[in-house]
Amino acid sequence: NLSPLINGGDSQTIYRAGTPPLPLIASFAKALRLALEEQPKAYLKVKEINNYLRDELIKIDSITINSKIDSSPYILNFSIKGIKPETMIHKLEAKDVYLSTKTACSSKEDYSKSIYELTKDKEISKTSLRLSLSKDSTMEEAKEFIKILKNNL
């Protein structure tokens, strides 16, 4: 038996009082439709940027890419051997480049358990960095990131 979330009249539904907010419902439906229309194009753009970043990062001897090739192109996880992730984060922050350490699900751990499961290497899982991309990311930003990263290794 469900209890009402908001008490009041039950002319529309027994679970919520009041009239459904039609303008909000219509606005949400339109926003969802627009997002779904642009999603395939945005996905391909982000995939292209991710591929460029991968191609450039594998050229650097001290870097290991942890994200699998078929993983989401919106997140690229990599490790830099011999450099603490916090040190690199601070160097990059000084250049207005922002990364995260480890993985979102292991931010309080000494190492990333999910990266360890992927790599079976504890050192790599301790030094992982997470680069997030979005539909608003650009190839120019990716090129600038690679340049800044190389200058800070």
Regions found by a protein language model. Give the residues of each.
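Pyridoxal 5′-phosphate
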Residues: 1-153
